[in-house]
Design a protein with these regions (language model features):
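Helix-loop-strand module that forms the ligand-binding subsite of alpha/beta enzymes
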Residues: 1-62
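Glycine-rich phosphate/pyrophosphate-binding loop and the adjoining helix
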Residues: 59-120
């Protein structure tokens, strides 16, 4: 999971990406372009945000989601599944609802994650 900082990934996640995404390690350059060395498995990405993004209530752009899609595809991860807890800096009751929605989503995908692990 990751928060959104200044419309995109926080510095700590960017540092991790820079350490992992390496030519001849996590991707190779071919005549057809970059080819990831990882076998694509489902990747579940939780995003937390103080405001709203990617909806009719949005007050901020979302550069995080397209960036993660592009950079993870570079290393071979194409099956990305995003879910979010938005508006976390707002009214306490809304935060409780968002938190419960995120928890419900995680509980619903739990069996899917377990099945993915079994197929590894």
């Amino acid at each position: 999971g990751t928060p959104i900082h200044n419309f995109t990934v926080p510095a700590s996640l960017k540092t991790w990406i820079d350490l992992v995404v390496r030519v001849n390690r996590s991707f190779n350059i071919t005549p057809a372009g970059k080819v990831g060395t990882l076998d694509s498995k489902p990747v579940y990405i939780a995003i937390a945000s103080g405001g709203f993004f990617g909806s009719e209530h949005s007050r901020q752009p979302d550069f995080l989601t397209p960036y993660l899609k592009a950079i993870l595809a570079t290393i071979g991860l194409h099956d990305l599944r995003f879910f979010s807890a938005q508006g976390m800096a707002l009214d306490v009751n809304k935060v409780k609802v968002q938190r419960q929605d995120a928890l419900d989503h995680v509980m619903n995908i739990g069996p899917t994650i377990a099945e993915s692990k079994e197929s590894c």
